[in-house]
Amino acid sequence: MVLNYDVIIIGGGIVGSMTARFFSRYQLNILLIEKRSDVGSVTSAANTALIHPGYNAVTGSLKAKMNLIANPIWTQLAEELHFSFDRCGDYVVAVGKEELPKLDALYERGKRNGVPGLSLISAEEMRKREPFINPNVSGALFAETGGMIDPFGATLAAAEHAVLNGVEIRTNTEFQDFLFKDDRIIGVKTNNGDYSCRWVINAAGLYSDMVMHKAGVRPDFKITPRKGEYLILDRADFELKSIYFPVPTNVSKGIMATASVHGNTILGPTAREQDDREDKSNTIAGLAEVLSGGKKLIPEVDTRHVIATFAGLRAAGNAPCETPGVDYGHDFIIEIPRKVRGFLNIGGIESPGLTSAPAIALHAIELMRDAGEKFEKKRDWNPVRPARPRFRHMTDAERRQLIEKDPRYGRVVCRCENVTEGEILAEIHAPIPATTYDALKRRTWLGTGRCQGGFDITRVTNILSRELNRSPLAISKKGEASKLLVRPTKILGGSHED
């Protein structure tokens, strides 16, 4: 048995990280374990990057309740934790008169859910607001509380803030099984040893069903990964003003077109269920579907505008809504099961899971309070995570001042995104260190421009090698199985370290 904790959180995605952040407010010894080399690197890093108003969730469901509570919290979180967030509002766009009744239905559902700031607007008004929109638009639903966010940035910010307030995070640490004493969970087994605790919180995302089955809970619950494929367009081609959904289908919210906090336009996602929980590959059929759906909203979209593709997996579950009278079979699970003590179970957190994460964390605290846990506030808890400089967002005067303090901020490593050596070093030596190329990419946005890392990757590899005191051959893209270099090339004079 290694160390003893009050709470162990399994999973470092947005739900696990936000839970760690909110729990760090209290006098608890907390450990978060994440099986990958970085927090937030799966579903929380590859999604549509939106904060939903709440008009889509089925009335009476836990999704609807969590969405409504969490939506306004994001404004304060962005201010305190310093991640990118823009409450620009969002639109559901009808193309053709036959789609207008669906807008009315969404509007009425939003009102029933208590969503503020909803309005139905005319086709003429929609065309005025967004010049790129399909000229055949017949009307739109506008929700002023919708927003775009950096989802990985928010996850990292929450996790780092938790660390700054005393939470311990162990990456490359994979949950294997529970330790029991009678009907109580007293710890977890991992690939790095055993850890004892009084409470375990399951926030394992795509693997949350497997974790709960290990606890002997909900044997019929199943996560089915739902792949969503996306296209990223060059920011020079389109500058959309907001977020644009088509009218939704029974399976998903449809192929949307959205601006992003990084300036690019994003199209997607598809919604295809699969068995593989790791396969995030793109497909020809999937990308063709995204392009076709994107053209329905923004007809000028063309493949020549595409600079990158990606895919993400949503943890779609089959849990029925437990609100009496609500027939809905895909609700969130947030519970303390009766049959096992010391276990708080979170699962099936698909959309609007990102939006709902703060409310899920707060709900977890209330459930544990109801179960008898005492939450005593820390006197020295700091609500703020310090901001780190982002060179591309600074004025010339601010840049000069920063370079005077640290000349490394004057060395541009990624030209497309204007990322400097100073920014890279700050992330390598941050509370949650970036130790791979992709970890730096998610934090600084290097390698995401038109050249897609062609200019910076060798420079970043050298910086990581130097700062981590490792051979360049040991530097990876996203973990041990993804080394960037295979062997030194034949050289004339000097050595491969030069």
Positions of PLM-derived features:
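Helical element adjacent to the flavin cofactor pocket in flavoenzyme catalytic cores
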Residues: 141, 145-199
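Short beta-strand to alpha-helix junction loop
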Residues: 58, 65-68, 93-102, 141-160, ...
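Dinucleotide-binding Rossmann-like beta1-alpha1 core, especially the glycine-rich loop
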Residues: 49-129, 254-255
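Flavin-dependent oxidoreductases
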Residues: 18, 178-184, 189-283, 292, ...
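N-terminal Rossmann-like FAD-binding beta1-loop-alpha1 element of flavoenzymes
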Residues: 6-32
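Local cysteine-cluster metal-coordination motifs and their immediate loop/turn environment
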Residues: 410-424, 442-461
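C-terminal catalytic lobe of FAD-dependent flavoproteins
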Residues: 252, 261-262, 273, 278-412, ...
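Glycine-rich FAD pyrophosphate-binding loop
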Residues: 25-46
